[in-house]
Amino acid sequence: MESIIQQINQLRTSLRHHEHLYHVLDAPEIPDAEYDRLMQQLRELEAQHPELITNDSPTQRVGAAPLDAFEQVKHEVPMLSLDNVFDEESYLAFDKRVHDRLKRADPLTFCCELKLDGLAVSLLYEDGELVRAATRGDGTTGENITANVRTIRAIPLRLQGDNIPRRVEVRGEVFMPLAGFEQLNDEARRKGGKVFANPRNAAAGSLRQLDPRITAKRPLTFFCYGVGLLEGGELPRSHIQRLMQFKAWGLPVSERVKLCTGSEQVIAFYRQVEQDRGGLGFDIDGVVIKVDSLDLQEQLGFVARAPRWATAFKFPAQEQITQVREVEFQVGRTGAITPVARLEPVQVAGVIVSNATLHNADEIERLGLRIGDTVIVRRAGDVIPQVVGVVMDQRPQDAKEITFPEHCPVCGSDIERVEGEAVARCTGGLFCAAQRKEALKHFVSRRALDVDGMGDKIIEQLVEKQYVENPADLFTLTAGKLTGLDRMGPKSAQNLIVALEKAKQTTFARFLYALGIREVGEATAANLAAHFRNLENLRAADIEALKSVPDVGEVVAKHVVNFLGEEHNQKVIEALEKVITWPEPQQIIAEEIDSPFAGKTVVLTGSLTILSRDEAKDRLAALGAKVSGSVSKKTDLVIAGEAAGSKLVKAQELGITVIDEAEMIRLLGESS
């Protein structure tokens, strides 16, 4: 029996060695047929002696039964996200913040790595054996994907070597190389199956299969980049040395990892990786920069759910070339006419793009764009596609000039362009069906009147059937009328009537926001409501009085005066006043509130992770803050969440105090 055990152990050791050479180092020493022979030999021995099968045997990677659902996993150490920077100026600002917090002037050493475009996972090893794998989820709770991760041959089921901690949680990214992605999609096309839009989606979809046997067939791989939980052992106090320790244990680590001293070396690494990006064989969307010293990392700490000692330096949006087939003109809520290019579909940054905004007539003129042109399309911020250039030497002879309409394409009203403004607008107001629809959608939206169940499709039908012309008409609807709409039964109709009834009780700030006055967002509406307290006072205010309100300048003041002075709007507001009520806003006297926010003009920027933006606004306002939507010299405080952008940069330029979300939460707690 001892010889059988020895033979099995030798086969397992040999197979693990060759798996590591093939899947991690990409340097196989034996042909596939020999690997298959060794695997088959092990399978036969284990079949004869099932009592000798162990969880970490190479034979146990594939074949677990399908799951009904993934169980939830609580991360013992939260899986934090990273803040982003998008240009060198923003990176230098990050570098300065790190130096300032450490009170250091000398160049710091950073560990620079690739920012892989895959799925973040956590691998928990106990006494060297992989016992659990989980997705990031929301950072606190993820999904148990152990059975699927065990099928990824790049991930060792047992760590090799010495000094392995009793419990260690390795973190990294599961991704799909481009060659495997293309092969997977080619096979799907042949079989008429689902084609994935990009390797990231393919990796995520493969990893979250309830049947591990499907995951096993997908060409997934893995690179590790950090550690979470660590118990019963020690790791080096340098991030890059930790990565080298992982590598010694048999874990895959990217070769493109480099120590850089000072910002110049970091930027040089970023530029080189950006240049080499196309030849890597897998998708990345930037580089990750981390302070290498663990001692310094601990000094720097964390902001809400991101470390202060690291940032993701993202690449610019990817670009592709395609052709403009047509240009159409859309009408927005305020009558803005927006030209939209209809494109020959093209994949940009992993998404099929067939439309792109052209913004306005000035942009069309600047580009020199014609219908039929070959253009460069960029996904701005990897979200909104836009045309950024024309390939003039590919212009066809029959390319047509783009004529901006003189009349609204929806209602036929005149289009006007106010001097000094780039945007042309339909003058039809609520006579225009397009504006009517968008105005009504805004009126019932969540942060306005919040009419539950009143979706876009319902609004469109109400306008098309001429049941509703303005917001006041919504409150004249009956269940009988609503049941005449598509997919609207008696119960749904009655629920909508109840929701409309509930919406009659609101706040003055929500009401003002719901009216859709140009450039009056939530923050401005709240400031107007707090300052004037009722409609009568607001109607009586002139431009100078309005300009005394935080967040209200000359332009916004004119919009408010013009809106309230327009006869049609007056009639709609009078009709709404008969059915909608709100308590007069409580007058907050800053001097009487013991709060660091009292009397301060505060701007929120970036993504908040602990409170929602709405909750943060409400709590700040309750403590006497005036929440503004833009940064100016009048701003007292900026609260910066994750991925804070231009507002944060402007605040730093103006020398305005900036705090993070964690500090805001602390101050809110002290004030309550």
Curated annotation (Swiss-Prot):
InterPro entries, A to Z: BRCT_dom (IPR001357), BRCT_dom_sf (IPR036420), DisA/LigA_HHH (IPR041663), DNA_ligase (IPR001679), DNA_ligase_AS (IPR018239), DNA_ligase_CS (IPR033136), DNAligase_adenylation (IPR013839), DNAligase_N (IPR013840)
UniProt-listed CDD domains: BRCT_DNA_ligase_like (cd17748), LIGANc (cd00114)
Cofactor dependence: Mg(2+); Mn(2+)
Protein's gene: ligA
GO MF, one example: DNA binding
The reaction(s) this protein catalyses: NAD(+) + (deoxyribonucleotide)n-3'-hydroxyl + 5'-phospho-(deoxyribonucleotide)m = (deoxyribonucleotide)n+m + AMP + beta-nicotinamide D-nucleotide
UniProt binding sites for NAD(+): D32, A33, E34, Y35, D36, S81, L82, E113, R136, E173, K290, K314
Organism for this UniProt entry: Yersinia enterocolitica serotype O:8 / biotype 1B (strain NCTC 13174 / 8081)
Name listed for the protein in its UniProt record: DNA ligase
NCBIfam families: dnlj, PRK07956.1
Disulfide pairings: none
PROSITE patterns reported for this sequence: BRCT (PS50172), DNA_LIGASE_N1 (PS01055), DNA_LIGASE_N2 (PS01056)
